[in-house]
C-alpha cells in the first residue's frame, strides 16, 4: 500500500499514470545510502526525462512483471495492482506482492533485519523516519493470554 500525490499542477504524476496503465508496479525499499538518489527521482521531471538516469540509478529486469526494479535497492517487491482509491489529491494503490528480491547479505535462515535499515516517508513533502530504533518482544500465545485474563 502506498500513495502518489498529484504534481504541482494538480495532475497525476507519471508514476500514477504508469501504474494505472500497466496494472503493476515495484516497491523499492530505500536505505540511507540511496536517500539522495531517491530524493532526486521524486522531482517532477517531464515525462521524457528518466528519473532513474537523472538520479544515477540503474534498472534491473523484474521476474514476474514487466516493470523494472532499481538495481541498487536491497529489497524490491514486484506487485500487481489490486485496487486504487482516490483520496483528494492522492491516489492510494494497493498491490499484491508477486515476487520479492532481497540482497544476499540480508538472507539466511531468516531475514537479517539488523543488516537492513530502510527509510520511511511519514507524509508531507519532506518528513521521513529511520527504522533503527528497534526492539524484540516474544509473541504471546493464546494459552498464555487466556491464563492471564
Located regions from the model:
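Basic, polyanion-binding surface patches
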Residues: 1-149
Amino acid at each position: 500500500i502506498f500513495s502518489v500525490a498529484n504534481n504541482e499542477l494538480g495532475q497525476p504524476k507519471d508514476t500514477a499514470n504508469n501504474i494505472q496503465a500497466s496494472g503493476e508496479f515495484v516497491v523499492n525499499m530505500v536505505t540511507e545510502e540511496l536517500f539522495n538518489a531517491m530524493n532526486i527521482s521524486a522531482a517532477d521531471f517531464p515525462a521524457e526525462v528518466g528519473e532513474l538516469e537523472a538520479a544515477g540509478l540503474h534498472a534491473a529486469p523484474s521476474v514476474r512483471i514487466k516493470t523494472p526494479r532499481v538495481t541498487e535497492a536491497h529489497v524490491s517487491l514486484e506487485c500487481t495492482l489490486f485496487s486504487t482509491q482516490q483520496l483528494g489529491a492522492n491516489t492510494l494503490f494497493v498491490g499484491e506482492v508477486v515476487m520479492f528480491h532481497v540482497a544476499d547479505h540480508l538472507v539466511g535462515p531468516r531475514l537479517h533485519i539488523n543488516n537492513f535499515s530502510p527509510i520511511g516517508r511519514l507524509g508531507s513533502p519532506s518528513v521521513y523516519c529511520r527504522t533503527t530504533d528497534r526492539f524484540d518482544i516474544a509473541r504471546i500465545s493464546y494459552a498464555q493470554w487466556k491464563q492471564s485474563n
